[in-house]
Amino acid sequence: MDKNNCINRRKFLQMTGAAAAGTTAAMIGCSPHKDGSGALGPVPTDMMTFRTFPSLGDKVSLLGYGCMRWPTMPNPEGQGMIVNQEVVNELVDYAIAHGVNFFDTSPGYVMGQSERATGIALKRHPREKFFIATKMSNFSNFTYEASLAMYRNSFVQLQVDYIDYYFLHMLGTIGQRGLEGRFLDNGILDFLLKEREEGRIRHLGWSFHGTLEGFQQALALHDEIHWDFVMIQMNYSDWKNAAAGRNVNADYLYEELTKRNIPVLIMEPLLGGRLANLPTHIVSRLKEQNPDGSVASWAFRFAGSFDNILTVLSGMTQLEHLQDNIRTYSPLLPLNEEQKDFLYMTAELMLQYPTIPCNDCMYCMPCPYGIDIPGILLHYNKCINDGMLPRSRNDENYRKTRRAFLVSYDRTVEKIRQANHCTGCKQCNITCPQRIDIPTQLRRLHNFVEQLRQDTLDG
């Protein structure tokens, strides 16, 4: 690395105002804070950055549409929520009109409704205008028959006769719930390889969540199988600090794939939104560095600044998020080394905030006991980032922060869905890609809330 492009820690602290990290925010309450992502002018329609790899032959938009967070609405014909198909159609139309051509879904996304909604929206466009990616998400029943049925149903739901990018979903666990049990022992991987030979799968790869051993196990098959791509969680926080959250650092994953010439797809460039909802003093300093860019744009520019990245997926529920990301990649302005170093040090500073690494992926849902797991964890994280977590009773603002935390908790999460209803069944732990011990965290948060409520009664 060019020493002239490096910034030392003292300069970084001056840039971020880290000395203010421990101070109490001026506003009481755990409401979202402003991130500067308002109207930023026109959205380019013909300036999208594309990536092409000889091994794939596809011209893919650097911004990919993650279909895990399609907007929903109450079911007018019954209970629960359904995908708002009209809004999905509008988002897909807008994305394609502005150069986005990669759409990533799964049989399990959005309560099992994502593939169908994505298929309906894309069917209205010429097939050559888009690339579709979906997954074998055979987590609970991974017999050959069940896996085959899931695969064939994806074609029906998506209304296609070939799939551009097909994933072995969420590899990384050693044993029966990993590569061996879900894909090797049952023979389904052999079937998928034949499907690739016959063209119904154009490219075959996998997404990674898990341990170093799990990653190396899947990668070791490359010489025999020739993986066409791999998707990893990569952002400036996980680049060197993922191991702090029981995951594998993204710099290692990226380099191992790159030296084997395996194209990389990125998921969680925003860490489930956490890198767009940073502590207030970090937000202000990022805005000082780039007043016209959103906080999220820093994370997307980082993700796109590496040559071996095919596409960066973002689950864009709202039009303004889609517009912001299109601006960032139309065209991409890559980060220089000094800017990357600034973000690496920002990530180190973020470690001072004891947040729970929930990315709101919803893999833990639905809870069999109705608990709103992501809602509880994200509320806690928001209060930490806003400096509104009640701490010592001796703090001057303790009563105000205590009241604000409890009021916002009850408003954010229905009482019947709060942490005290957790039975510790650990079903959620099996599917959490961040490897969070969810029952332990829920028990800890419940005890914390009960202590605050008891303090209220005690005066």
Predicted regions and their residues:
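Hydrophobic faces of well-ordered beta-strands that scaffold small-molecule active sites
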Residues: 61-65, 103-105, 132-134, 166-168, ...
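Structural motif corresponding to the early beta-alpha repeats
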Residues: 109, 125-144, 148, 169-172
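Glycine/proline-rich, positively charged
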Residues: 74, 141-265, 270, 278-282, ...
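N-terminal binding-site loop/beta-alpha segment at the start of enzyme catalytic domains
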Residues: 2-130, 161, 191, 197
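Residues that line or immediately flank small-molecule/substrate-binding pockets and catalytic motifs
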Residues: 67, 107-110, 167-170, 208, ...
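Structured C-terminal cap/extension of enzyme domains
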Residues: 27, 226, 252-459
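Active-site mouth loops of central-metabolism enzymes
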Residues: 71-85, 136-144, 286-289
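Conserved, mostly hydrophobic/aromatic
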Residues: 53, 65, 103, 118, ...
